[in-house]
Amino acid sequence: MRHSIARILLLVSIPTAFLPRSGTAGNPDTRPLPQESAWTSLAAAIARSAEDYRIGDDWGKLPVTPEQLATATPEFVRAAKVTSTYGGGTAFYIGKFHGHHLMGTNHHVQASMNCRGLARFQVLGAAYPCRKVLGHWPEIDFALFEITVPASDEAVLAKLAKNFSFDRPLTAGQLLLTIGHGIASNPGRRLVANQDSDCKVFSDEVRLMGDPDEYNPGEYQAWSFANGCDVSHGDSGSAMIDRLTGEPVGIIWTGRIPKSSEAQSSATLDDWLRTGSHEIWKQLSYGVPATKIHEVLEGILESDTSLDRETVETLRAFLDSRN
């Protein structure tokens, strides 16, 4: 979630996020994390307030377990494998474009990182360092960065790569899946996923809007669609995935915090969706749709003459690629 959330998260996770621990796919680094510090104590305190984040009747952001992965859909398994921690937020592997392995996250996560961190994939048991930041753009709260991948892991990642669904508009009621490292009821930042009945698109409209976080709102606006997915601090940078096709259709960026009692009733949510209530623009979670990411980056390629040639060609390959 957005700038306000990242401020807290980057503090919470610094003790573990920047440790020199690494591994490759299938050969994870199993050294223990450090003992609890003041920052991890802060994480635990924040995590106890999960009710502030809940949308609908139940908190649906649940740990991803080996048992779940053994019976989950291929779309779910793929999404879990490509999701990583990245500093105080989340990132996800998109694919290899013009010879570069690209990850996506939020602008507000990347702006605080400066390519210092590792992308740590819990399910794959691998960690890859940031090599280059291609850019981060506040109006879509999106960032692209390149990771260094050893040759031995190329084949593994190639099978998992999936670009955004750039050409498909969102539809109200479209079922979603979000997987990230939010800390609500999760102070250890395990991988958690939400695919409950409320996690769906509530608006086929896209609006430029500010951050509705009442605790610590961010300073800029981003193009947004409303959704009912449970997300918390630490989920910043998570892909928003079509639950049926497995295609990334956007990226989370913020949400109303704390949630109102009305937004914590699934029956009320159903009524808001049915009637197109204006409350969906005040009370829920908000993501940036893939269609708007494509539109804005196309404009940047046309207008930003400061981009180096390699970045331009990589962005062009990213925007032109289709699944």
What would you call each of these model-derived segments?
Residues P20-F97, D211, E310-N323:
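Protease-domain processing segments flanking chymotrypsin-fold serine proteases, especially trypsin-like
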Residues M1-L9:
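Bacterial N-terminal signal peptides that target proteins for export
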Residues T65, H107, H136, H294-L301:
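Residue-level recognition of alpha-helix boundary/capping or hinge positions
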Residues F92, S238-A239:
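A residue-level detector for well-ordered beta-strand positions
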Residues I8-A17:
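Bacterial N-terminal signal peptides
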Residues R31, P217-A222, M240-N323:
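C-terminal subregion of chymotrypsin/trypsin-like serine protease catalytic domains
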Residues P28, R48-D52, G56-G60, P66-E67, ...:
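Functionally engaged cysteine thiol sites
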Residues T73-G88, K96-F97, G104-S224, G228, ...:
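Serine endopeptidase catalytic core focused on the charge-relay Asp
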